[in-house]
Each structure stands twice: as C-alpha cells, then as structure tokens.
C-alpha cells in the first residue's frame, strides 16, 4: 500500500509548494497498531528517483524518500517495497543503509526487481537491425546484476530482500535457478500475465505454474498487481487461483518433512570420537527408515557370500559392531542373520559409557549371550578373537569429517585376513554454491570473545534450502576398508575445476558423500543419487570469508587437502579473479571454537577442520608452528598466521597495508 498518494509530489526546496498546509497523508488512526504491524506492506512513491542526474530531482527525491521511510517506521510496518529500475543505485543504497543503521525499527525492505528488464521485452521493429550489446550484462542476467550491485553496496544487509516481479516472458532455467538462491520474500504477479481458461477464470501458463511451485517452496508471499483483466469474475479470483496452486503442489517427501524447520539452519558438525553423544541424538538417527534397512541388506548379502549353504549350521561368523551407539546396528545384524539362516557372534564396541548402559540393557533383556558388550575405544581394544565382519556407521556429512578413516584403520587389527568391512568404501563430493542466506547466517555467528572472522574458519552442517548450486558436485576424497596398509599416510589433496554457466557469486562449497556398504548396496546424500527417504545426514557447508563474483562461462577451481597437517583451499576463477585458502584435517589438526547449535548432527564443536582464507594468488605453507598464508611478491612477510598458543589457537594478521585486501 502506498504510504503517500503516488501522485502527490511534495516539494522540499521551493516556496510556496514547500509550505503547503495540511496533512501529507492519511492518519495512522485508520487502522489499529496491530493491523499496521502485521497486515500492511508500505510502498515507495513511483516518482521518487534518488539517483537522478538532475540535482533538483535528486535532492527532492532524497527528502521525500526519507520522509516516507520514517513514516513507515513510525507506523511499524513489517516491510517496505522499493523499486530497483537501473543498474547504478549508489545514492539509493546510501540512503537505505543510513536509515537501517540509524533507526530503531525492524522493518524489512523488499527491493522490487523484474525477472527481465523492461527494455529486453520489447520487440525489434526494424528487421536485421544490429542487436546492441548491453553494458550492464546480457538480457537474461541484467536485472540480477542490478540486484547484486545494490546488495553489495549495502554490505549484504539481511534486512534487504527481493520482491521478484514475474513478467509474461521467463528467462532460462539457469537464470531462474540463480534467483532461487537469493533472499526472495515476495513474488509480484501482474494481472497481465494471467490467461483465461474455458470457464473465464484467470490461470497461469505451465511454465509460470512451475515457477510458482518453486517459489512456494521458499514460502514467499505473492502480490497480485495491475488492472482487472477478467471483468466477468471478481478480482479475488486471482488469489483463489494461487490458493488452488498452493493446495495442489507436489506433496513433500519424507526427507522434506523431517527437515521442516531446519532449512538453512547452521549446525556444528558432530565429533563423536571426542564427545559423547546425547540420547536424543541417537534417537533421531535411529528413526531413519532407510539407513538401517540398507545396512541389514548389506550384512545379509555378506553372510550369504561368506558361508556356504552346507556350513550354515556350523560356521559362526564373528561380527564386530564398532561404535554401536544404542544398538540399532546390532539389531540389524541379528535380523540379517535370521534372514540368512546364519549363525553369528556379535561384539558391540562402544566408547560412550552412557550408551553402554543401553547396550547392556538390550543384552540382558533381548540379545542374551549371542552379543558381547565392550566398553572401549575401538582403536585400543584388544579383541579376544578376530572378526569376519566389521560394521560401523562413523561417516559424517563430508564422509571423513568425523574421522572414520582414522577409527577404522585403527581397528583393522581386529579383522582377520580376508575379512569384510561395512562400509567398504566412501567418497566425498564438493560443489560450489551461492546463497545470500547462508552467507549472512555465517556472518551473524560472530562472538565478542572470538576472532572477528572465526565463524568463517569452520564448516557447518545445514539443510540447504535457499541456495543455488553453481555446478554439479565432483568427487574429492575416497577411502577403502580394509586397507592393505592401515598405518599409511592418509594425507590427500584434490584440485577441482567447475564450469559455471551464469554470472553469479560464490559464497562457499557444499559437501556430500556416497558410500558403498557391500556389493552394489549404497547410501548417498549427493543430490543426483540421494537415497530416497534417508535423513540421517544433511550436507556440509564450507563458507568463504569474501564472496567471489564469477561465472558466465568461466571456470571455477577448488583445492582441498585432507590428512594430518595437509593444506588445501577452494576458490572460483572468473571475472572476480582467483581465490586461495588452506584447510587442515585430522585428529591432531587445530580448530577454532564454533557457535553452539542444536540438531541431529549439530551439538558438538567442530575440531577436525580449519580453513584459512586469503587474497588472490596467495600461497599456503604449513609447518610445526602453524599455517601461514604468504604473498608471492613478499614470501617472507605472512599475510596471515595461525598458530597454537598454550592450548589455544591464535590467528594473527599484519597491519592493513600489508594484508592486500584481507
């Protein structure tokens, strides 16, 4: 709703219009305070142009804009709609940022941005006329560049969001995908884009319907705008049609139902090797309908392959469940043995003394002598006999980030020659993503007693929702069990390149994994092969400190290191240049404390992974005294030094003139 009449142009410089008597707009007494606070979205007058090149228009627009914004704050409006009609809006960004930082209000500001620029919708009138090359981006991408430039000027303020205006023509799917990674709060649907069905009711085309379904997943609000083009029907028929689409959209999957409320919620990765998990955490994992059925099938297949039919009554397979928790894998093993009509002897090994109480209760009440409960670290336990089969569920969202390779290699001495490990192999995957929501969430994790940028030095487990994946995931690290040399150096390094098809901004990397339990039985959280209905793992997010623009046919690169004292990094090489960083992974690798967060895999502090990030073309050196990020021009002068000091980890930076943009 316009706060002031859209044709009421106020004058703030010249008399007599400047001193015009009477109220400028309607009284706030027309509605109750609650209605103003919950039902009304303010709208800036269309004649206001704070970035006009005419000084008189610009000054008058500045004063009028501040007047309307201040009156909207006085009313307590929940949101205010402002148009974004061009690529250069520095004065608009300055005025809005000043209003946000100096005012005592919580109003959201929705920037009205069209999917396609109006000038790109007109038809060519002259045949064979040369097509002009736009200066501010290609046709499909022009308005996104407007938005990106504006939100960058406003320093990614989380109170500035997008109201996306949908026109009759839609851009390519790649462009729409990129918009869905932006903080869209509303979608504006002009009445002119609605068609008429056989009964005279307004409807949308199939392409527009698919877009509406995708926007509904982001829980955006819809604004119907324009003249009534279906006079035979009431205007509310537009809203009734949108309600019909909302009720008939595809039902959510089991994974989406479980993740409801966790969308884009940052959680610290679990470290079960270091911390003892809580009972509620075990309970959440045990509710997964897919994971343990797959484990049961893998154990069943393994038992059939290892024991001949004529020996099934005499051959007793020794199964060691490493990290038994509260016993779900033990129960899966028992069910598999009954299904295969095989005899098994089970050792349930668990280091958490609290979970051991539950295991002993299971043994006393259900399992009996067939199961032996062992309260010990699997790496330190001296087994009374060697196992035919090792079963574990030590994987994290990035496969090895919960130190599964170190644990299983440390317990391999319990496995006899020719024995089997379930899982037998697992691979981590990495994909570049763009997400203003996640970038702002990470920035908001800052704490006063920590380094001001410590929140960017750790990964987060998160249910990715409001994001745009810039390229398909690529494999990073692969581990096999059992390994011929369990004491090998586990350091690995991978350098990846991603082809990015649209102009975009890199905010970080999403990590996934795939694992082969046995034979062709797999579990996966990689989007292309995700196990249907499985929700034990959310993806992992590696943020970067400074967002990097790029894409539009350029190549993105990522370098990642895994192992004790290894170095790695990630980046995007495009129009924004190259980015370099370092990552340390391993049981002894340093870490920075992370913000506490709840959730299934988010109650522990991240201690296995540290990322140090720096400017373009930086070089990382890792030594006994920590990690240094060096400038190639002056390698003797570190840009950033991270070192352990008396049990803590301190990040030092030189004076600003030496930091080259850090």
Kindly give the residue locations of the regions a language model identified.
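Class I SAM-binding transferase module
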Residues: 1-291, 297, 304-318, 322, ...
């Amino acid at each position: 709703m316009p706060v002031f009449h859209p044709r009421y142009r106020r004058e703030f410089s010249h008399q007599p219009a400047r001193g015009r008597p009477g109220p400028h707009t309607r009284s706030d007494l027309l509605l109750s305070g609650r209605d103003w606070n919950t039902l009304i979205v303010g709208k800036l007058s269309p004649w206001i142009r704070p970035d006009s090149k005419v000084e008189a228009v610009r000054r008058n627009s500045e004063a009028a804009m501040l007047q309307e914004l201040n009156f909207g704050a006085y009313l307590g409006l929940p949101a205010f709609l402002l148009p974004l009609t061009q690529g250069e809006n520095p004065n608009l960004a300055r005025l809005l940022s000043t209003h946000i930082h100096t005012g005592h209000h919580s109003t959201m500001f929705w920037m009205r941005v069209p999917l396609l620029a109006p000038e790109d919708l007109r038809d060519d009138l002259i045949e064979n006329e040369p097509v002009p090359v736009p200066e501010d981006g290609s046709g499909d991408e022009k308005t996104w560049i407007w938005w990106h430039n504006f939100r960058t000027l406003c320093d990614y303020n989380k109170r500035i969001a997008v109201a996306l205006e949908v026109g009759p023509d839609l851009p390519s799917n790649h462009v729409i995908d990129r918009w869905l990674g932006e903080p869209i709060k509303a979608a504006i649907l002009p009445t002119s884009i609605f068609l008429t069905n056989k009964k005279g009711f307004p409807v949308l085309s199939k392409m527009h319907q698919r877009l509406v379904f995708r926007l509904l997943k982001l829980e955006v609000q819809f604004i119907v705008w324009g003249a009534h083009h279906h006079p035979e029907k009431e205007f509310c028929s537009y809203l009734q049609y949108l309600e019909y689409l909302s009720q008939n959209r595809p039902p959510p999957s089991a994974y989406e139902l479980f993740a409801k409320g966790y969308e884009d919620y940052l959680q610290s990765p679990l470290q079960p090797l270091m911390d003892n998990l809580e009972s509620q955490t075990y309970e959440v994992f045990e509710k997964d309908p897919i994971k343990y059925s797959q484990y049961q099938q893998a154990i069943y297949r393994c038992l059939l392959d290892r024991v001949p039919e004529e020996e099934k009554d005499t051959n007793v397979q020794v199964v060691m469940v490493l990290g038994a928790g509260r016993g779900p894998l033990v129960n899966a093993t028992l069910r598999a043995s009954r299904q295969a009509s095989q005899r098994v002897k089970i050792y349930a090994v668990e280091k958490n003394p609290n979970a051991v109480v539950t295991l002993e209760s299971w043994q006393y009440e259900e399992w009996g002598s067939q199961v032996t409960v062992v309260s010990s670290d699997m790496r330190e336990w001296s087994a009374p006999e060697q196992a035919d089969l090792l079963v574990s569920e030590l994987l994290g969202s990035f496969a090895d980030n919960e130190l599964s390779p170190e644990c299983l290699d440390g317990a391999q001495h319990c496995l006899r020659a020719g024995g089997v490990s379930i899982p037998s192999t697992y691979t981590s995957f990495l994909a570049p993503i763009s997400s203003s929501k996640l970038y702002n969430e990470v920035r908001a994790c800052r704490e006063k007693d920590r380094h001001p940028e410590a929140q960017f030095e750790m990964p987060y487990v998160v249910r990715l929702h409001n994001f745009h994946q810039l390229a398909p995931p690529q494999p990073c690290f692969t581990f096999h069990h059992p390994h011929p040399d369990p004491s090998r150096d586990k350091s690995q390094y991978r350098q990846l390149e991603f082809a990015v098809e649209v102009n975009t901004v890199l905010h970080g990397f999403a990590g996934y994994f795939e694992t082969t339990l046995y034979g062709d039985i797999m579990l996966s959280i990689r989007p292309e092969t995700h196990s249907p209905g499985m929700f034990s793992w959310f993806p992992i997010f590696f943020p970067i400190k400074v967002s990097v623009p790029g894409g539009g046919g350029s190549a993105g690169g990522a370098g990642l290191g895994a192992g004790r004292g290894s170095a790695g990094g990630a980046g995007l090489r495009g129009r924004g240049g190259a980015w370099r960083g370092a990552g340390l992974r391993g049981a002894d690798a340093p870490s920075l404390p992370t913000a506490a967060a709840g959730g299934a895999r988010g109650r522990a502090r991240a201690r296995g992974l540290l990322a140090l990030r720096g400017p373009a073309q930086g070089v990382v050196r890792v030594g006994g005294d920590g990690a240094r990020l060096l400038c190639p021009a002056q390698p003797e002068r570190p840009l950033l030094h991270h070192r352990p000091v008396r049990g803590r980890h301190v990040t030092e930076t030189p004076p600003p003139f030496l930091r080259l943009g850090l």
